[in-house]
Amino acid sequence: MVRLSSRFYLQIVFLAFALMTGVPVYSWGLTGHRTIAEIAQQHLTNKSRKELKKLIGRETLAWWANWPDFIKSDSTWNHASPWHYVDLPGNMEKQKFIEDLKKLPGKNLYTQIQTMLADLGNQTLPADQRRTALYFLIHLVGDLHQPLHVGRDEDAGGNKIVVYWFDRKTNLHSLWDNMLIEYQQYSYTEYANLLNTREPDQVKTWQASPLEDWFYESHVISDSIYAASPNEAKLGYKYNFQFQKILDEQLLKGGVRLAALLNQVLSK
């Protein structure tokens, strides 16, 4: 019960802070992250479900999917901001991209997914540390599948590119974080159930590819987004039609791959 009330308090503080300061809600927004988490929940093994119950009781993955964004209003977590993205030049060949991804300095989205996965699977660590690793892992795998979290440094992953979504001024990153998803007009449970219909063989193929391939997929998609979304572009129905399939597939991939990682470390 203590964690419940703390979570609600943290949500209120974060949302109030965002409204007062104009800070954007980051990385897929609430609906996107919860959709990915709900899809993952549906692909967990029984063993993983039992292990998660020991850590978070009856709470769901979707419940904690946005916690790493909520804590951005707490300055003690400022060091975690770079964990949500990687920035590399555009239009890179796969081998060069992966080489440069592995050489990026400091802690970032690539390094921290691996760190959180290792911490979650380490049963010698305190439960609180493993819970924190779980919350971040849920969220960061979602961030990875938002293509502009594998964007370009010169425009801060699209944050500096102004676009107009049905005449509403915004930036390219926010469009992909929130507006495209909200335009579909589904709750996260509706969206998850709608998307979670692929054949098992396709799901297994997505899950089996290495982490570096997931990053490169997002990189390639981000290149296509940049090409279709120049500064001051006016976007609407045509843009949604162009990218809806990609949007849906990224959410689904994020969910089934998150489940694969959780099953990997919790079903031992």
What are the functions of these language-model segments?
Residues 2-13:
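Bacterial N-terminal signal peptides that target proteins for export
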Residues 14-19:
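Hydrophobic helical h-region of N-terminal Sec-dependent signal peptides
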Residues 22-24:
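N-terminal signal peptide c-region/cleavage motif recognized by signal peptidases
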Residues 26-140, 147, 152-268:
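N-terminal, motif-rich segments that launch catalysis or mediate targeting to/interaction with membranes
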